[in-house]
């Protein structure tokens, strides 16, 4: 019995020693690791059985087993274990790869990676041995990381990206703020409309767009507004919202939490808990809605010059932590329950507002309507009723009672570093036109309840977008009056929409829309290229 066991132990040790020659194995590393693990388990069991026999001392076979177990973890050629760089928020560990596919300098920490040459790193990324998203943390050089990722992408896909610009971007600035795993940036033309005379000040409005005729149209609207004495704006409300979803054991219990959260007597306490998250975030109100035993609590707060989504989310987490002490049976489902509502056209935003709620108006003189807009006051009023009001109602629009507010909002958002996806709710707008001064002049207004903008954070840090904000005089934070820059930017958005609405409606009323687009938004060049 002892002889057979001894022979098995010898074979195990021999196999283990052969398995230690990592680089000499023709098998993939995952198979080699599996064999090594089996050998480790068998050797450990064998050693434990022998050690449990106290009537006989350890022999050569047992000593060899101990040596093997030690050498397995101390072998100089063994692949290094994953370093702390795995804790990068991506969720997931590195897959084992053949040693030849991963250059030796990459087995260590960032210092070794920095010394590796570009070819080694690109090969590792292309093969999957080095995850692309770790390049910045391993190299410590964001520009180099983007350049090598770009080359690895070319090798993996077999397609070049020469037309995608690389130089001219500050890749360090976007790290952890704007974009992950960058390989370049997209160029968009930026036009300037204006001057827009708004609240007694002139603005030259930057617009990033690929739609020909858009900037020209807004520019014409600005000219009509300025020639008539300018436009005026009113900020109705300033409050970013976040609505977590929580679940309670019963609808009755959810109603109790609703009553507690909305009670005026508890507001100061909840506001104090909420406001701990920021110097600028200040809770304004809490409104709740029930769906069975699920409760949606809509927290609204001012956020200074930031758009404020992160700010309000942190404050909400503070309040949820407090409420769980008061209502220990409350189960937090999500910090966002879609009652906020972010990046979706919703009735709650249309009615309650989100971000900045702005009204902008102007009285356009009759002669300006005729000379600049090439139409009449009567035609414009009739068109607005039939198209923007009745037509949108027939379509079942939700906040879409306008001609093309989204066009202007998106162009301004991209130019000034806002979140383009928030164009969804920010473009909710109702355009109103009326005859005034005995029908001689035109009163036009736009009401926009959910303009979500900021002058700090997000894409506002990028050089191009910061330049556009600077052009408008709203770059960065207003230290003298926190929040003033973001509020002014919201009014500029509304004023620009006013100009765009006025000009497009005039083009439709006069029948000039198609002619204008044929002049400024032609696709004939692309068609000719495709044909050739």
UniProtKB/Swiss-Prot annotation:
Residues 78-111 are annotated as: Disordered. PANTHER family: 3-HYDROXY-3-METHYLGLUTARYL-COENZYME A REDUCTASE, 3-HYDROXY-3-METHYLGLUTARYL-COENZYME A REDUCTASE 1. It catalyses: (R)-mevalonate + 2 NADP(+) + CoA = (3S)-3-hydroxy-3-methylglutaryl-CoA + 2 NADPH + 2 H(+). It is found in: Endoplasmic reticulum membrane. Keywords: Endoplasmic reticulum, Glycoprotein, Isoprene biosynthesis, Membrane, NADP, Oxidoreductase, Transmembrane, Transmembrane helix. Residues 77-117 are annotated as: Linker. The active site is at residues 211, 343, 419, 517. Pathway: Metabolic intermediate biosynthesis; (R)-mevalonate biosynthesis; (R)-mevalonate from acetyl-CoA: step 3/3. Residues 118-532 are annotated as: Catalytic. GO terms for molecular function: hydroxymethylglutaryl-CoA reductase (NADPH) activity. It is an enzyme of class 1 (oxidoreductase). Its EC number is 1.1.1.34. Catalyzes the synthesis of mevalonate. The specific precursor of all isoprenoid compounds present in plants. GO terms for biological process: coenzyme A metabolic process; isoprenoid biosynthetic process; sterol biosynthetic process. NCBIfam families: HMG_CoA_R_NADP. The chain crosses the membrane at residues 63-83. One of its GO terms (cellular component) is endoplasmic reticulum membrane. Glycans are attached at residues 275, 521. This is 3-hydroxy-3-methylglutaryl-coenzyme A reductase 1. It is a single-pass membrane protein. The keyword NADP applies. Residues 98-107 have a biased composition (Low complexity). Belongs to the HMG-CoA reductase family. The keyword Cytoplasm does not apply.
């Amino acid at each position: 019995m002892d002889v057979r066991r001894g022979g098995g132990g010898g074979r195990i040790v021999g196999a283990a020693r052969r398995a230690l020659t990592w680089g000499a194995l023709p098998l993939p590393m995952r198979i080699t690791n599996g064999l090594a693990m089996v050998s480790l388990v068998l050797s450990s069991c064998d050693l434990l059985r022998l050690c449990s026999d106290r009537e006989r001392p350890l022999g050569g076979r047992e000593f060899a087993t101990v040596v093997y177990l030690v050498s397995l973890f101390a072998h100089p050629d063994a692949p290094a274990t994953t370093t702390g760089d795995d804790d990068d928020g991506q969720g997931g560990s590195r897959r084992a790869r053949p040693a030849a596919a991963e250059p030796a300098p990459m087995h260590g920490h960032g210092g070794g990676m920095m010394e590796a040459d570009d070819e080694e790193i690109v090969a590792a990324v292309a093969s999957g041995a080095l995850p692309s998203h770790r390049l910045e943390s391993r190299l410590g050089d964001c520009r180099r990381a983007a350049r090598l990722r770009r080359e690895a992408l070319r090798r993996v896909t077999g397609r070049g990206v020469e037309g995608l610009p690389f130089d001219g971007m500050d890749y360090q600035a976007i790290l952890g703020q704007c974009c992950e795993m960058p390989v370049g940036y997209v160029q968009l033309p930026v036009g300037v409309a204006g001057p827009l005379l708004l609240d007694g000040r002139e603005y030259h409005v930057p617009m990033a767009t690929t739609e020909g005729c858009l900037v020209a149209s807004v520019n014409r609207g600005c000219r009509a507004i300025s020639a008539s004495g300018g436009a005026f704006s009113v900020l109705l409300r300033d409050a970013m919202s976040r609505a977590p979803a929580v679940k309670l054991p019963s609808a009755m219990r959810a109603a109790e939490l609703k009553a507690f959260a909305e009670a005026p007597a508890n507001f100061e306490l909840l506001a104090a808990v909420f406001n701990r998250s920021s110097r600028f975030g200040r809770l304004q109100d809490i409104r709740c809605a029930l769906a069975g035993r699920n409760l949606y609590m809509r927290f609204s707060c001012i956020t200074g010059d930031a758009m404020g989504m992160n700010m309000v989310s942190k404050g909400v987490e503070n309040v949820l932590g407090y409420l769980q002490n008061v209502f220990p049976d409350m189960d937090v489902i999500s910090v966002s329950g879609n009652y906020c509502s972010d990046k979706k056209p919703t009735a709650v935003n249309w009615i309650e507002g989100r971000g900045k709620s702005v009204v902008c108006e102007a009285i356009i003189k009759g002669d300006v309507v005729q000379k600049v807009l090439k139409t009449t006051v009567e035609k414009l009023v009739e068109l607005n009723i039939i198209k923007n009001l009745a037509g949108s109602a027939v379509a079942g629009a939700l906040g879409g009672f306008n001609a093309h507010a989204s066009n202007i909002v998106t162009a301004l958002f991209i130019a000034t570093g806002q979140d383009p996806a928030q164009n969804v709710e920010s473009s909710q707008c109702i355009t109103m036109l009326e005859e005034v001064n005995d029908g001689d002049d035109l009163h036009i207004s736009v009401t926009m309840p959910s303009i979500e903008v900021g002058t700090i954070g997000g894409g506002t840090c990028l050089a191009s977008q910061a330049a556009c904000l600077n052009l408008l005089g709203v770059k960065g934070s207003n230290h003298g009056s926190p929040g003033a820059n973001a509020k002014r930017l919201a009014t500029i958005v509304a004023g620009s929409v006013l100009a765009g609405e006025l000009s497009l409606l005039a083009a439709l009323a006069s029948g000039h829309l198609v002619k204008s687009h044929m002049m400024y938004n032609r696709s004939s060049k692309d068609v000719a290229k495709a044909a050739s």
